[in-house]
């Protein structure tokens, strides 16, 4: 079950990469730090409010629902706000100057390192590990093919599925979603047809930030500790998932995330639960897929597909 749980988190973060790439044909490498800020922001807010239940996790009832709802809301708000700030600072000024694509890449990587190092230097614990809030005790609910499935696993997988379903429905059925697809297909034509391209790009970053914030909340449920650089490895794997599934394709990001989680989990299991071996297997799988299908498994741009 761990593979599906990990894959669900990767898939949500991968959606942020694939949305921005679908609209701008650029990679938002600062998306990993949006994830990190959402995770820590939620943790600190809940801790300051006196709701940190790490020593005595809540199992049921309104206290659990209320704490989780508050933490999810804070994660999503911080994720969305951080992503919008990245767009305003690291992307929009460069777009106004018609800067080369390489400059966007450097700007995004610079923003990513700046955010991570700022938290590492000025955060309450600097570069030490933070004990993250644990909301639900890991009581086994049932076993599936000899795999232990607990309450947290179910919440993460179901939560990721709901968020992904909402996003697909939003992109396919809403007016803003149609605007996103129009800009992804041809920004100049969309602008001539009255679409506010700058606003659509901003909304795309915002939606990607919401996905990263939701992923950060779910990640916190299953992870007891995190550091200032927690977003780096998650971001690299989520980007790998997006490329594996076909970057620019929403369904591809979801498929890539789940596949990557399963490959990583089973790869680690083959060598005595060594997580580093699992990570190696996931990148080997990416190379193999790209050798035979350079565009990824579902390598179709978002503009040509109804996600």
List the predicted regions and their residue ranges.
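Cytosolic-side transmembrane-helix boundaries in multi-pass membrane proteins
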Residues: 107, 127, 185-192, 196-199, ...
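Extracellular/periplasmic helix-loop junction at the C-terminal end of a transmembrane helix
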Residues: 111-144, 268-276, 298-304
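Alpha-helical transmembrane segments within multi-pass membrane transporters and channels
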Residues: 55-111, 255-260, 264
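Helix-loop-helix "hairpin" substructures at the membrane interface of multi-pass membrane proteins
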Residues: 6, 145-226, 250-256
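Pore- or pathway-lining transmembrane helices of multi-pass membrane proteins that form conduits
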Residues: 33-37, 94-120, 230-243, 259, ...
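Membrane-embedded helix boundary and interhelical linker motif in transport proteins
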Residues: 1, 24-26, 30-85, 269-270
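Membrane-interfacial amphipathic/re-entrant helices at transmembrane-helix boundaries
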Residues: 1-13, 41, 52-71, 97-102, ...
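Transmembrane alpha-helical segments in multi-pass inner-membrane proteins
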Residues: 10, 68-76, 205-212, 218, ...
